Each structure stands twice: as structure tokens, then as C-alpha cells.
């Protein structure tokens, strides 16, 4: 499984150099790494990507252009305590979870909801941090023996959830401060084997 969060602060798409990339051509950048994800995924492997409403149409198009099969969009409802009110319009209290597979899906007896109402505890460790409870649910889709790859690890939430579940994991984070946060989080996380990780 590849888990990623292409969006950075204020709807900017993340860049491996400085965390921000102009919104003008986010599809080109996403297509490049999504094509590599497709190549790396085994048949039946899943891509799970969190995205803001501003880039949702682009991501669903580019996922398919990269050769993955779009399976749907789930919703993270950040709940009333984390919403941004919009004068004369709807509150922004949701993020979207685009999921896709490389080819036919593997058989899996896990049935997740389409909406996850979950408040992120404060203080946040990363600007686009996701709740650990949601990460734990997402990794339930992974059969034993698979590798969870988080291309933009941030504070390491999904890596910690994968580790707790006894799954193999690999993460990437170029920001030194967030790398340190991820490493500390993973050092404090154990799985059923009790083996402590070294670092990401």
C-alpha cells in the first residue's frame, strides 16, 4: 500500500524540496510520482491519498491517468471543533481520501465506513497531520506481509499505525524537523513482536 498526502499548507501541493509547490500544475507533479507508485505497487496493491477539496478533481483524474483504478473517495469529517467557517457559504470541515488499486483488488474481509468523524488532538505535530485513529482504520485494509509506504511521512502517523498492526513500513520525509518527530514517534511505538524500530 502507498499512503500519501500530496497537499501542503493552504492547498499548495507538496514539493520534495521546500514543502510547497505552486498550484498551477499540480497534476504534472502528481502524475510523475503516481506513475512510480503504480510501478512499485504489486497487483492488487492500494493507493490511499488524503487531499483537500481544492485538489480533489485533479487528483482523481491523475490517479487514473497514472494507470491506477479509482475505487472511490471517502471523507474525513474533522467535526465542528476543527472546521473553518466560510461567510455566506459552507464550513470547510472535511478532507477527502482518494483510494485506488493497481488492477483487481485482493480479497479482504474488512469493511470501512465512507465517512470518518474524527477530531485531531491538539497540539498538532504537523500542518497536515491525520488522526492516528483514522490511520489505524486504513491500515486494516492491508494483509499481513505487505509494506506500507508513506511518501510524505510528516509526523509519522501512518507509519506508527502500520507498526502497531505488525506490518512492514517505509517512510520518506525530507524536512529535518518532521523527520525527527516521525523518528521519535516510531521509537515510542511497538508492535506485537516488541521490536523497536531504528529510524525512517
Where do the model's predicted regions map?
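Core catalytic lobe of class I
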Residues: 1-180
Amino acid at each position: 500500500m502507498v499512503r500519501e498526502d500530496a497537499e501542503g499548507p493552504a492547498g499548495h501541493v507538496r514539493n520534495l524540496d521546500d514543502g510547497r509547490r505552486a498550484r498551477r500544475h499540480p497534476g504534472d507533479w502528481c502524475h510523475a510520482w503516481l506513475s512510480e507508485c503504480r510501478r512499485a505497487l504489486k497487483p492488487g496493491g492500494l493507493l490511499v491519498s488524503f487531499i483537500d477539496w481544492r485538489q480533489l478533481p485533479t487528483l482523481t483524474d491523475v490517479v487514473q491517468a497514472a494507470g491506477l483504478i479509482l475505487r472511490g473517495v471517502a471523507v474525513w469529517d474533522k467535526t465542528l471543533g476543527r472546521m473553518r467557517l466560510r461567510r455566506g457559504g459552507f464550513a470547510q470541515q472535511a478532507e477527502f481520501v482518494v483510494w485506488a488499486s493497481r488492477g483487481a483488488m485482493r480479497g479482504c474481509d474488512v469493511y470501512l465506513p465512507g465517512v470518518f468523524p474524527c477530531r485531531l488532538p491538539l497540539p498538532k505535530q504537523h500542518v497536515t497531520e491525520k488522526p492516528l485513529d483514522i490511520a489505524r482504520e486504513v491500515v486494516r485494509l492491508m494483509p499481513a506481509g505487505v509494506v506500507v509506504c508513506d511518501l510524505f511521512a510528516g509526523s509519522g502517523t501512518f507509519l506508527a499505525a502500520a507498526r502497531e498492526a505488525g506490518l512492514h513500513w517505509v517512510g520518506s520525509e525530507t524536512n529535518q524537523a518532521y523527520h525527527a518527530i516521525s523518528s521519535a514517534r516510531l521509537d515510542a511505538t511497538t508492535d506485537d513482536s516488541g521490536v523497536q524500530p531504528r529510524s525512517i
